[in-house]
Curated annotation (Swiss-Prot):
UniProt entry tagged with the keyword Cytoplasm: no
Residues in v-SNARE coiled-coil homology domain copies: 135-195
Protein name as it appears in the record: 25.3 kDa vesicle transport protein SEC22-1
Assembly and binders: Interacts with SEC24A.
Family according to the record: Belongs to the synaptobrevin family.
GO annotations of cellular component type: endoplasmic reticulum; endoplasmic reticulum membrane; extracellular region; Golgi apparatus; Golgi membrane; plasma membrane
Amino acid sequence: MVKMTLIARVTDGLPLAEGLDDGRDLPDSDMYKQQVKALFKNLSRGQNDASRMSVETGPYVFHYIIEGRVCYLTMCDRSYPKKLAFQYLEDLKNEFERVNGPNIETAARPYAFIKFDTFIQKTKKLYQDTRTQRNIAKLNDELYEVHQIMTRNVQEVLGVGEKLDQVSEMSSRLTSESRIYADKAKDLNRQALIRKWAPVAIVFGVVFLLFWVKNKLW
């Protein structure tokens, strides 16, 4: 059964549309939505090259399609046929491109195409029951194959992003520490110069003062 559906722009991870009633009766729905956001973040960084992938998470599987810089993602039960999940996404993709194609790149706010929820709900109902003649025919369609689509674990996929975040954080910390070290080095050099030349400056100052006083008296 289809549990959740989201559409986002790949270039920046901006959510464009979603099924509004998704996740209402789903335990830990917030956790899964956070995982989806993390997946979109990874995709915006170009960390997953596959245009089609399945990502296992607990008792569910995320399936997604990337096309035209847009990611179409759904979360289904593990028992739900992979073939139907991707055909469901194909239907969403075709309609979304037809209706919103020219405006996708210029969308500036989250869920700019929230009205697309109507089509999501209508299409989801068609795919919920895998035993209907329509869906059985789709499962038997030999022209649409999903065997080549990779399946990975969510921790494996998100772990890549976490490691890159750690590297980025470490790099920022090292840069900050290098700046602090450079500033301290400048201060130490300045203090060393003062200690080196201060006595000389004092001697010259005393000599100059004595010379000036002598001239005044004479």
